[in-house]
Amino acid sequence: VKVSGGEKQRLSIARALLREPNLLVFDEATSSLDSLTEEEISETIRSVSQASAHLTILIAHRLSTIMHATRIYVLEKGRIVEQGNHESLLEVKGLYYAMWRQQVGENKPAVV
């Protein structure tokens, strides 16, 4: 059976969630997915993370993937330069804000 890159990612995520581990690490987990599937997977990860007592770490360049995280760490040249939740990082108008505006677009509101 041949599966696409996105299908492989979805299967890997499902397998990880079914194991119910104490720690989940997702490194660019939705990078090969279209935006609708990304939102579905992100919602599933959020639901599972909130329903159980484990730590979930999301590593992503696509900020929409991490915007609902409890704590976001912004790295620049290997160092943490900002930290907070989505709203507080937008208020600071630092690097996270600039990246958010670049990814979402100048004409759209900064807070979703």
Please annotate each region the language model reported:
Residues 91-112:
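C-terminal boundary and immediately downstream tail of ABC-type ATPase nucleotide-binding domains
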Residues 1-92:
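ABC-family ATPase nucleotide-binding domain "signature/switch" substructure
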